[in-house]
Amino acid sequence: MTMDFQITRRYPCSYLPGELARSRIVVTDDTLSDSNTYAQLIQQGYRRSGSLIYRPDCDYCHACIPVRIPVELFDPNRTQRRIWKRHQHLQIAWHPLHFDPVHFDLYQRYQKSRHTNGSMDQDDENGRKQYRDFLLKSTVDSFLVTFHENEQLRMVSIIDRLPDGLSPVYTFFEPDVPGSSYGTFNILWQTAQCRADRLPYLYLGYWIANSRKMHYKANFQPLQYLIDNQWQYRTTNR
């Protein structure tokens, strides 16, 4: 398989208001389905969105830093341990990627609560197409996980499996349960899955110091950062 890379045009940054971003995208002459090749790209800081594999390649900004949890060293804090215990009653099931109207309804409500007037909160056919393209298109080893409470859907995760870990693509959850901490529980659960499957890393995507949306990732310690093409620890994570 021949693999090449292209640089996109500049576009408004999703995380830092007023900034312009660019991405380097993977271009292949065939469908990228080899797990080892995909794992190498993830290890180099790439992420997946639908069939698109990319990493930031901005002119002057280097704020997007790939991070991962070394699961054997992960030490949950007191708050995380409480959240873990609180949600042990959730019914969790693994599925192949598929469209379900109940999942889509939860996704829409989550988007509208978090990203009002965003490009992903459309409830028409175009919105369903964006949902499928963003979450349900994959040529790698991907699966969908549902979390139910008393037969009510509470959370959905799309996750890629790698030879050396798990890489969550996207998670959305019930926005009308205040203080649920579903997102924190989800990372704790994925960390536990890595440990159970003897996978050393949970890849969390990008951490950005000046983005409040990304601050939660620094709550999971220790955390490794990809800096100058080397995975390393930092003495200051916040």
Swiss-Prot record:
Reaction(s) catalysed by this chain's protein: N-terminal L-glutamyl-[protein] + L-leucyl-tRNA(Leu) = N-terminal L-leucyl-L-glutamyl-[protein] + tRNA(Leu) + H(+); N-terminal L-aspartyl-[protein] + L-leucyl-tRNA(Leu) = N-terminal L-leucyl-L-aspartyl-[protein] + tRNA(Leu) + H(+)
Any one GO molecular function term: arginyl-tRNA--protein transferase activity
Signal sequence bounds: none
Superkingdom of this protein's organism: Bacteria
Chief place of localization: cytoplasm
Compartment(s) of residence: Cytoplasm
Enzyme Commission numbers on file: 2.3.2.29
One Gene Ontology term from the biological process aspect of the record: ubiquitin-dependent protein catabolic process via the N-end rule pathway
One Pfam family from the record: ATE_N
Any single GO CC term annotated in Swiss-Prot or TrEMBL for this entry: cytoplasm
Keywords: Acyltransferase, Cytoplasm, Transferase
Similarity-based family: Belongs to the R-transferase family. Bpt subfamily.
Function text: Functions in the N-end rule pathway of protein degradation where it conjugates Leu from its aminoacyl-tRNA to the N-termini of proteins containing an N-terminal aspartate or glutamate.
Cited HAMAP family: Bpt
Official protein name in the record: Aspartate/glutamate leucyltransferase
Protein encoded by which gene: bpt
